[in-house]
Amino acid sequence: GTICLPEANIEIQFQVAAEFTWAVPAEKNHRAVIHQPKLLCTVNTGDRTQKAIGYCKIYDGDYPKFWGYHFVHAFFPDYGIIWSAEATFGEEKYNYFKLLNTSQTEKEILLNGEDSYHRKTSAHGRIQDKIYHLKFDNNAFANWSSILRNQPSTMESKLCLEYRPAILEIDDQKVGEGICLKEFCFGTIT
């Protein structure tokens, strides 16, 4: 696909390289959320071109009115991609810790974490009896925020995005450095 922002002189071309689906517990019709943790991107800004890895999440459904979440998507060039969330939809808890591992083989392997949780500067999960710690710097090198509203619905949520340096540790051993997008949002969804 292509995204064009002519007023900013930006064009992004992307290709979906990995896609996974699963349901969110609070969605009344059990519609699956689509996760695309590996978008292969080319970003053109005037006379400059940059390669990038992107993420897309697509969901539609009948959700409770209130929600809140912390989400992180991190890319480690020599190891893989981690995406993780700790969320509440209404009174339903929803969290996950996923690793798209590219370090062991040429074939990508999706590993699902258990016992996952988030803190202000970290996300944690257990995968195959190993403890994964995704740590990110307290200082963002780029950030953006906005109030999300839709009419005629009553959605009003504050969305914040922050880009930060990240470190991946497995069983207290550092295995990689990368970049992460930390996203958090709280308010109403309907």
Residue ranges and their predicted role:
Residues 1-190:
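Structured soluble/peripheral alpha/beta segments that form catalytic or ligand/cofactor-binding pockets
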